[in-house]
Amino acid sequence: MKIIEGNLALKGNEKIAIINARFNHIITDRLVEGAKDAFLRHGGDEKNLTLVLVPGAFEIPMALEKVLASGKFDAVCCVGAVIRGATPHFDYVSAETTKGIANVTLKYAKPVTFGVLTVDSIEQAIERAGSKAGNKGFEAMTGVIEMLNLYKKLGE
């Protein structure tokens, strides 16, 4: 059986955007740090990494649409943090952000990863932003690098 998979090696000329939701910035700043670390560790050139800041997770799909429509980027890593509160707001924001990112990704057929935390507590968010559960920003960036290389092997 033939296996086709991406790898984690960047050549240094890949242009990747990170879209970061500033809301809950104490968490999301750490996710960005993790994503940047992964990009650099795997051979990325910092001049080819762009950070796009949006107010909150709900705005990520709109920014993603503009970023991909520009044609300037090979892949996008989306990060944010939606933390459950006492109202149903969490459910609406989480669902629409997820659907929006998925829809834009399918429209442009470019590698995009979902590094948006959807958690029940600030403690869970901290654990996923560099504590007990690793850094999900780092993981999202490695995922987008792997998918970028897979797309190349599949002929985009």
Swiss-Prot record:
Protein name in UniProt: 6,7-dimethyl-8-ribityllumazine synthase
PANTHER family to which the protein is assigned, alphabetical: 6,7-DIMETHYL-8-RIBITYLLUMAZINE SYNTHASE, 6,7-DIMETHYL-8-RIBITYLLUMAZINE SYNTHASE DMRL SYNTHASE LUMAZINE SYNTHASE
Entries under NCBIfam families matching the protein: lumazine-synth (TIGR00114)
Function according to Swiss-Prot or TrEMBL: Catalyzes the formation of 6,7-dimethyl-8-ribityllumazine by condensation of 5-amino-6-(D-ribitylamino)uracil with 3,4-dihydroxy-2-butanone 4-phosphate. This is the penultimate step in the biosynthesis of riboflavin.
Pathway where it operates: Cofactor biosynthesis; riboflavin biosynthesis; riboflavin from 2-hydroxy-3-oxobutyl phosphate and 5-amino-6-(D-ribitylamino)uracil: step 1/2
Binding site for 5-amino-6-(D-ribitylamino)uracil: F23, A57, F58, E59, A81, V82, I83, F114
Source organism: Campylobacter concisus (strain 13826)
GO molecular function: 6,7-dimethyl-8-ribityllumazine synthase activity
A Pfam family that the UniProt record links to this protein: DMRL_synthase
InterPro entries associated with the record: LS (IPR034964), LS/RS (IPR002180), LS/RS_sf (IPR036467)
Xref: SUPFAM superfamilies: Lumazine synthase
Lineage of the organism: Bacteria, Pseudomonadati, Campylobacterota, Epsilonproteobacteria, Campylobacterales
